[in-house]
Amino acid sequence: MKTPRLPIAIQQAVMRRLRENLAQANLKLNRHYPEPKLVYTQRGTSAGTAWLESYEIRLNPVLLMENVDAFIAEVVPHELAHLLVWKHFGRKAPHGKEWKWMMESVLGVPARRTHQFELQSVRRNTFPYHCQCQQHQLTVRRHNRVVRGEAVYRCVHCGEPLVAG
């Protein structure tokens, strides 16, 4: 799938939210953390990722275009919080108590670990598998691990190994 061109107005809205959240955090934490690099290269079903060492936030342009307001309100502060926790506390659990505190007490945003965006447009091909009780769809990555003998996946309901087909 070709990455969509993001309108400049959306990029500006993302940057505005990032700068507002960063200024708020710097004020509350009495720090001067720098602005992270912002890129629109995230792919797949992840809305965004925070890269600690490069101090960079990668956002999914497809999910952003499809969910502009919710994406800017939730994903931008979520990823910024990861970077701020790393700067403020060092390496901690990705969604641990420090991250939750940063989201809720510092940025004033509900601390949700996952987004609820519709994923139909970014979902890759899946492969049919089954167990004794139901059908399953495995991603390409999981399917390839099964084929190579690197993994066995089990049904969360009946506990039986999943079988292709």
Swiss-Prot record:
Compartments it resides in: Cytoplasm
GO-annotated biological processes: response to stress
Binding annotation for Zn(2+): H78, H82
PROSITE patterns xref list: ZINC_PROTEASE (PS00142)
Domain SprT-like: 20-163
Assigned keywords, A-Z: Cytoplasm, Metal-binding, Zinc
Active-site annotation: E79
Gene Ontology CC annotation, any one: cytoplasm
Cofactor: Zn(2+)
Main location, first listed in the record: cytoplasm
Matching InterPro entries: SprT-like_domain, SprT_Zn_ribbon, Uncharacterised_SprT
Cofactor binding mode and count: Binds 1 zinc ion.
GO molecular function: zinc ion binding
Matches recorded under NCBIfam families: PRK04860.1
Protein family according to the UniProt entry: Belongs to the SprT family.
UniProt protein name: Protein SprT
Biological source species: Salmonella arizonae (strain ATCC BAA-731 / CDC346-86 / RSK2980)
Lineage of the species this protein comes from: Bacteria, Pseudomonadati, Pseudomonadota, Gammaproteobacteria, Enterobacterales
